[in-house]
Amino acid sequence: MKVVFSLVIIVSLLSSPLLTFSLFSKSVYGDGLFMEELGASLGDRTANLLIRMSPPVVTTETIQQQSQKPEIQFRLYDNQSDQNFKEVTYFITIEKDGKTLLSDWFFNPNGNLTIEMQPRNQNQISIYGELDPIMNAYTTRGNDPVVAAGPIFLEGGLYHFIVRILTVDFSRTILPDDQQPVFDSWLSIGAAENAVLDVNGQQIPIKVLSYYDEIGNITYNQQANSINFTMPFSYDLERISDPANTVFIHQEVEIPKPSPLSAEGGYKGFTNGKDVTNVLMVDGNNETKDVVHFMIAKPAVEQIASEYLKKTGSNNTVEGLMTFSLIPSKNGSMAMGGAMDHMMPMDMPM
């Protein structure tokens, strides 16, 4: 039920006016979800690129414990007709924390490309697939996806996908450099951190999942009766405020129930000391734990970043920490278990 709930609330936020965007420029980008849809001009046509991860919820824990092999799906299609472009050659680069993990050519005659990620502890990524004889680009073997095996998705946080379109309609004709659309996208891998907190002599296990960056310093404040944790964050207000960029911070906190930290039945949330209770969502379906979601969209992130820069006296670009606090409260966000029993995951067609 946790996966279903996570998918439903993320999809609902994707349909919100605050998170919907379509840009028609040579280079477009977003900032972190399980799926992004970006648009760019392609001559006299508008090309949309859909990038999505399957399954939608991937974490370092599911990769390690379940040997999960997530797939990244790319679909380039005409915005007006909704038909795939044919003979598409993609030049795809994947980065993590500024380090290039993969950079290569991929081709699909039908415009749909699927890359299966096989996370492994090895020095570099190896790519397995048929080589197209014209473009010397990796393509699928029958119905099997291209496979990228190596040190990818082993760490949680944001992964940067840079996708350049080299051919469309005719695989033998490479588009001029100044006519090649470039899409910048960020997909999130959940970083799982566990801690045991001493609450008035009782040991309470807590799990925090971040879909933005690594979590650190999980503590309990007895005076405030709060669970606290931190996350690295770039307070680059120019990047955050860019109309072309979506920013979405999703954190999950798992709290056993009944326990001193779930006894009130509801929760208040704070980010950098700012009350964000209105963006908390609580999954109460599980009888043994509450799963509390911080779902912070771009307008709130902009305000939090602006206040942080004012307090620190910094300029528009600074690397720092973002703090989170969660407090059990009868006046906070309550569990939404009853309404979620009828929710089903959405299967978005390629």
What is each stretch, according to the model?
Residues 68-72, 225-227, 245-251:
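Structural beta-strand segments of beta-rich domains
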Residues 239-263:
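Surface-exposed beta-strand/loop patches in extracellular or lumenal glycoproteins
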